[in-house]
Amino acid sequence: MASKYPEEGPITEGVEEDFNSHSTSGLDLTSGNKEEPLISLALLSMHTSKIVVWIRDHFFVKILSFGGKQKLYYICNQCHKGIPESGYITLNTKYYLYEKGPTETGTKGLTLMRRHVQNSPCFLNSRKESGTPKTDPTRPATSYSLCRSDYQEAGCSRPTPSNSESVCNGLGQPSERGHTSGESGGIMEEVSFISWLEGLWGEGFDYAN
């Protein structure tokens, strides 16, 4: 049975940035405008210009091009090209943690680092020190080693969820507001495809700012 996903090739139409310059090593950006009705319906309600989504073991980047045309481009299948168990993708100055298997909440997909976490002194210092966020492939939620070991020295304030931020689990049901790691103080927000769709019509999912 032929694959429903596009063949590999460079991203061309609608691109406003060189995403390769923002991606971690191992990510092979490939193209493909998807026309699935469910995805097309979701794109009608997107509030942001660029976002990464996970759909059945494949990664996509959604791009809003000039003229308001919205397109979904195929990035890669997480099971090939030597993609590690976990890592970071940077798009539109936002950091996404991707994982191969089920997350702590039982869903699969991408985790968006909340703005007040990715702008925290410990995260910024860890990037300055190593070039990329420090990751633990077995426990990605506790990957902020600088925050964990030099918590006070880095001047990190433990982030807390905002009342305006809502989180849905992989079934589209309300869940706890993010993943809190007692070691690192980091708060994560689940962005599986179903919760992403669910959040399009809710509050707290406008990633444009």
UniProtKB/Swiss-Prot annotation:
Signal peptide coordinates: none
Protein origin, superkingdom: Viruses
Segments of this protein annotated with the region Disordered: 1-30, 123-143, 156-185
Molecular function terms, GO-annotated: DNA binding
UniProt biased composition (Polar residues): 21-30, 132-143
Keyword Transcription regulation: yes
Keywords: Activator, DNA-binding, Transcription, Transcription regulation
Function: Transcriptional transactivator that activates the viral internal promoter (IP), thereby enhancing its own expression. This transactivation is repressed by nuclear factor I. Also transactivates the long terminal repeat (LTR) promoter, thereby inducing structural gene expression, initiating the late phase of infection. It is therefore a key regulator of viral gene expression. It directly binds to and activates DNA target sites of viral promoters and those of distinct cellular genes. Required for viral replication.
The name this protein goes by in its record: Protein Bel-1
Gene of this entry: bel1
